[in-house]
From Swiss-Prot:
GO-annotated biological processes: DNA-templated transcription termination; regulation of DNA-templated transcription elongation; transcription antitermination; transcription elongation-coupled chromatin remodeling
Transmembrane regions: none
GO cellular component: cytosol
Name the record gives this protein: Transcription termination/antitermination protein NusG
UniProt keywords, alphabetically: Transcription, Transcription antitermination, Transcription regulation, Transcription termination
Family: Belongs to the NusG family.
Gene: nusG
Quaternary state and interactors: Monomer. Interacts with the transcription termination factor Rho and with RNA polymerase.
Domain of life of the native organism: Bacteria
């Protein structure tokens, strides 16, 4: 078994959809077995996004790496067995099953910087850009195509130019009233 005396970052493959529960389970097992000195952070890199379903705004979580959990640990026989004993953990990524390789500090810093950029404010799940073509799917302009002129993420609204009888008409629409082409 490979031994490391420094806490390094490893990637665990997990059942998709269970990443949060696995991370919590690892934290609980570490406390229960008094192995805090061998483990650092356990994280599931994600951000909050706002979805609009049936006209209702709903916050949901978007995982950057679905099916994976990042864990900071000192790799030895007991820490390896603790992690592998957690239900729904498929194994470590990189190296061999009994000799996992840590990810580089550069890769970890890239992930952490991305998490810092995200911030606390949830972003819309669908991002629109001026000049992009969208299709109106609700309201009086339903089934018309239009070009996005302005985007207001605070109010979840778009200003779209819709061509009606050969003339371009600006229309304000909610995010839920349009879909990307």
């Amino acid at each position: 078994m490979y031994k490391s005396y420094k806490k390094r970052w490893y990637v665990l493959q997990a059942f998709s959809g269970f990443e949060g529960r696995i991370a919590q389970s690892i934290r609980e097992h570490v406390k229960l077995k008094k192995m805090e000195k061998l483990f650092g952070e356990v994280m599931v890199p994600s951000e909050e996004v706002i979805e609009i379903k049936a006209g209702q705004r709903k916050k949901s979580e978007y995982k950057f790496f679905p099916g994976y959990v990042l864990i900071q640990m000192i790799m030895n026989e007991s820490s390896w067995h603790l992690v592998r004993s957690i239900p729904r953990v498929l194994g470590f990524i990189g190296g061999t099953p009994d000799r996992p390789l840590p990810i580089t500090d550069q890769e970890v810093n890239t992930i952490i910087n991305k998490l810092k950029q995200v911030g606390d404010k949830p972003r819309p799940k669908t991002l629109f850009e001026p000049g992009e073509t969208v299709r109106v799917n609700d309201g009086p302009f339903s089934d018309f195509n239009g070009i996005v002129e302005e985007v207001d993420y605070e109010k979840n609204r778009l200003k779209v130019s819709v061509s009606i009888f050969g003339r371009s008409t600006p229309v304000e629409l909610d995010f839920s009233q349009v879909k990307k082409n």
